Amino acid sequence: MAVQKYTVALFLAMALVAGPAASYAADAGTPPTPATPAVPGAAAGKATTHEQKLIEDINAAFKWWPASAPPADKYKTFETAFSKANIAGASTKGLDAAYSVVYNTAAGATPEAKYDSFVTALTEALRIMAGTLEVHAVKPATEEEVPSAKILRANSRSSTRSSRFKIAATVATPLSHSTAANSAPANDKFTVFEGAFNKAIKERHGGPTETYKFIPSLEAAVKQAYGATVARAPEVKYAVFEAGLTKAITAMSEAQKVAKPVRLSPQPPQVLPLAAGGAATVAAASDSRGGYKV
């Protein structure tokens, strides 16, 4: 039952860009509730929209499914549950390949740590898609809501990785510009959003961001995802969205390559002579260049 619920949830996450929010919000609660052991729920107050709640549920499922599996079998457990699923005859070959790329490039000294790194990358990719939907959702002016500072702070707290993985907070920042984008001419809406998105990346991560290999892929994925929101034929919407999600996931693997931690061998304490005689032990300075923690 749990497999069914969260496999459906994954494809509902795909629908975040491929279809209107109203169509999947009602479906999100239809699958049976999993039996014990229960999936840990999202922290109270963190999820503020249907999209965010769905992503939190997916994230919890990623961590819960393989929890009881031996470390070496965690990815295999995930792959069986997700990659081999076939919902409504949808082809997932592109996503299957992306999963493999991310897992193979995931950093981790042990199979379990490697899987945790994989979960991080895939979760951030999904958050990008959810954030993209919120930015591009076109609402009547009377229904347009500007995210409050409280919501933006909650989005920021939900990302605890290194700066290269705080994509959720980066995507959340341009949400405040969605009103301006929606008030722009129809042909200029994405241009307005794209400018806000790129500006947020540079402001949050600084100049070195431009040298990260994953940034071009990430920006391409956002454009691809946006294309799915304007496609008319359902089969075209899904195909374009799958391509966008695949690029987003692959971009996360590029980020992992850049952000691999630098592990330094511990240095022995230094013994320095004092002017009045004797000695003082000074601990070696630690290097702060390490990457994110898995």
UniProtKB/Swiss-Prot annotation:
It holds the Pfam family Pollen_allerg_2. Disulfide bonds: none annotated. The keyword Metal-binding does not apply. InterPro entries: Poa_pIX/Phl_pVI, Pollen_allergen/Os. Keywords: Allergen, Signal. CDD domains: Allergen_V_VI (cd12805). Residues 1-25 form the signal peptide. The keyword DNA damage does not apply. Belongs to the Poa p IX/Phl p VI allergen family. This is Major pollen allergen Pha a 5.3.
